């Protein structure tokens, strides 16, 4: 399965002002850096949880799809197109309320286009972004614990784990 972001979220779920307050920074001199750290933290946490933290348009492709498959980077997925490699529109069905599954019978090269994402990000995920921004701000080099590189801080992982779809 391959996922491609067509249109990313338009507004980050954490503002620079919120991050500045969390970091106890009183000036705006670091706002550009903080904004970049917010985007980076959100993207890494989205990969960790397999969720979309805001509305975005995505394409997902399966080499072979026969039966039900969970649509990645949800919640609230709305499929707008389902085609095969030849460009033929395929019959499909979805099930699920907040987290959707796609059904397609014995098809190869299936690509769906869909929109997905939280309308309001849960507080724990917002705090996870803030914790990751703080860790990245304080540790601007690679982040190591006991000689091992960590993509996310333990605090951010702990806050996001209960939402993870991985």
Question: Predicted regions: what is each one?
Answer:
Residues 1-166:
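Divalent metal-cofactor coordination and adjacent catalytic microenvironments
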């Amino acid at each position: 399965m391959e996922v491609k972001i067509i249109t990313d979220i338009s507004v980050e779920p954490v503002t620079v002002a919120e991050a500045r307050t969390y970091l106890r920074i009183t000036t705006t001199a670091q706002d550009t850096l903080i904004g970049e750290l917010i985007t980076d933290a959100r993207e890494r946490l989205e990969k960790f949880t397999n969720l979309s933290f805001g509305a975005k348009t995505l394409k997902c492709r399966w080499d072979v799809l026969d039966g039900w498959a969970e649509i990645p980077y949800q919640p609230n997925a709305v499929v707008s197109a389902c085609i095969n490699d030849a460009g033929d529109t395929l019959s499909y069905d979805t099930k699920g309320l907040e987290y959707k599954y796609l059904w397609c019978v014995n098809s190869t090269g299936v690509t769906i286009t869909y929109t997905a994402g939280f309308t309001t990000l849960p507080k724990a995920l917002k705090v996870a972004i803030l914790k990751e921004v703080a860790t990245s701000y304080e540790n601007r080099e690679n982040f190591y614990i006991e000689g091992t590189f960590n993509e996310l801080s333990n605090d951010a992982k702990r806050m996001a784990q209960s939402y993870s779809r991985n």
